[in-house]
């Protein structure tokens, strides 16, 4: 979060173009485990039908995703492709800390999926960031909680209502800490 979205785009030219085509998509970025994958893929297919757009699946298990019209299997993606997928997504669904941070940084409509309870999620790194930014309403425990209207509009979150101010404050504290640490090391 030390870099803004504009700084990421400036320094990583590949994220200026899309890697999955021009049609709108929801990005599903997850650290899926094999035992969970098949049930989640079925839920993603249903979500795709409900929201009227394809779901780009970026996960270690993408190769196991069913070959179907609803899902775009992203089998090879390094950091540049990840940034491109994130930047160009209409919305993001993630269970990943970094997926959460980049969704916030790129001002995406997003949801954080947890298999536990919302209360449990608030105790995780993701949950703590969401609390600090006033975005705990983005936690879902079921894909049916994702609003198709929010996905389609892509503007479900008013970042200017407080999240941006909190993010700037967090960024400022982190940079000050790093500068102090470097100065201490030099002495």
Question: For the regions a protein language model found, what residue spans apply to each?
Answer:
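Active-site anion-handling motifs in enzyme catalytic cores
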Residues: 1-187
């Amino acid at each position: 979060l030390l870099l803004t979205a504009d700084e990421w785009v400036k320094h990583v030219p590949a994220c200026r173009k899309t890697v999955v085509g021009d049609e709108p998509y929801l990005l599903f970025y997850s650290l899926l485990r094999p035992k969970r994958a098949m049930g989640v893929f079925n839920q993603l297919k249903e979500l795709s039908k409900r929201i009227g757009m394809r779901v780009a699946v970026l996960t270690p298990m993408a190769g196991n995703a069913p070959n179907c019209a609803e899902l775009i299997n992203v089998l090879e993606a390094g950091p540049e492709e990840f940034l491109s997928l994130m930047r160009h997504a209409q919305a993001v669904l993630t269970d990943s800390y970094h997926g959460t941070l980049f969704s916030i940084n790129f001002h995406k409509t997003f949801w954080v999926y947890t298999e536990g309870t919302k209360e449990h999620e608030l105790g995780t790194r993701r949950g703590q960031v969401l609390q600090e930014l006033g975005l705990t309403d983005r936690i879902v425990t079921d894909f049916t909680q994702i609003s198709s209207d929010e996905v389609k509009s892509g503007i479900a979150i008013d970042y200017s209502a407080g999240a941006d101010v909190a993010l700037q404050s967090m960024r400022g504290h982190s940079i000050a800490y790093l500068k102090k640490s470097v100065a201490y090391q030099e002495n």
